[in-house]
Amino acid sequence: MTKPVWYYVGYYGGNVKSTIVGIGNPAIWWCGIIAFIYLLINCVCTRKKENLFILVFILCTYLPYALIGRVMFMYHFFPTLPFMMLAIVSLVKWITEKMKNNSFYIFYIALVILLFIIFYPVVSGMVTTSDYIDSLKWLSSWIF
């Protein structure tokens, strides 16, 4: 997520272009990091077996790639992604239990859907304005 792969750009004149970039949904990828940290703390403090299971599988699927010294691409992380999503579910469940209502579930799912819709033009090659594409460059390392 720090430097996505830029696959394609097509210029259609004026301020209109299309682009395809390999980038994940920030609500899943970045929240997955927070959820992973939550699992680490949770496993040390409470030793819940279901969270330990998720943590072990995240480490088993991620560590072999983390130790490689060459450039890594998003697809190297794909085997870990289902377990990161389970970690997010565990974190969202914990937050919802603390809040004693389902509003956080609704908020998080709405955020995931919203960010999918917002980033859809740059992951699909949909023709749109250059200004819109530029507005999606949240980090300076995002070149597309």
Specify the residue positions occupied by each region the protein language model found.
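Transmembrane helical bundles and short interhelical boundary loops of multi-pass, membrane-embedded
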Residues: W94-F144
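Hydrophobic/aromatic-rich transmembrane helices and adjacent perimembrane loops
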Residues: M72-V92
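Membrane-interface catalytic loops of GT-C/OST-like multi-pass glycosylation enzymes that act
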Residues: A66-F78, M126-V127
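Hydrophobic, membrane-inserted alpha-helices
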Residues: F57-Y65
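Membrane-interface junctions at the ends of membrane-embedded or membrane-associated helices
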Residues: I41-K49, I88-F107
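Mobile, glycine-rich extracellular loop/lid and propeptide segments
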Residues: Y62, L86, V112
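Juxtamembrane membrane-water interface segments that cap and precede transmembrane helices
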Residues: M1-I23, Y132-F144
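Hydrophobic, aromatic-rich transmembrane alpha-helices
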Residues: Y12-N15, V21-K48
